[in-house]
Amino acid sequence: VSWLGDVYKRQDLSKYSYIELKTGFHYYQGFRSPIDAEKEEKGYSLGWLHHKGRNKHHWEYWLDFGVDGIYACKMPTNYVIEMFCDRVAASMIYQKEKYTDSSALEYYENGRGKILIHPETDALIHHLLKYLSEHGLDQTIHYIITEIKE
């Protein structure tokens, strides 16, 4: 499927920038994102601030400021699909042999009430992660290709 190749080619290329590599090398632990360790030490992460502003598959990219303050914009479906792929891959990498098809859903649900995400974006990513937990990765990819992809 050609769109999967497009995702692969552009996915998270900013990770190779100096600021993100520096964060990754300095705070690498192997079981969680180096960004979390940098935030614990500094209270923020320069690597994350750089990363989220350049990668549209992160919900934080879609925050804007209006007359009533900060609000969440609805993410286009293709970026929600990329977010799904990113979350599943991160769960596989950080959880290693403890990974299950419910891992990404559990992680998302753990932080779900603390994020500012558009309700339709939240509903779609939650649906995809729940589908994965119930049907497995192969069926979920097939479902995304046949039923979700615009």
Protein language model annotation of sequence segments:
Residues 1-8:
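Short, small-residue-biased leader/transition segments that mark boundaries at the very start
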Residues 7, 21-25:
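Short secondary-structure boundary/capping segments
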Residues 10, 14-15, 89:
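Short active-site segment of divalent metal-dependent hydrolases/proteases
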Residues 13-22, 96:
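Catalytic Zn2+-binding segment of zinc metalloproteases
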Residues 24, 31-47:
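Acidic, glycine-rich loop-and-strand cores that form catalytic or ligand-binding grooves
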Residues 27-34, 102-121:
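Divalent-cation-assisted or electrostatically stabilized phosphate/pyrophosphate-binding catalytic cores
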Residues 41, 48-99:
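Alpha-helical scaffolding flanking metal-ion-dependent phosphate/phosphodiester catalytic sites
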Residues 113-150:
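Charged phosphate-binding loop/patch that engages nucleotide di/tri-phosphates or the phosphate backbone
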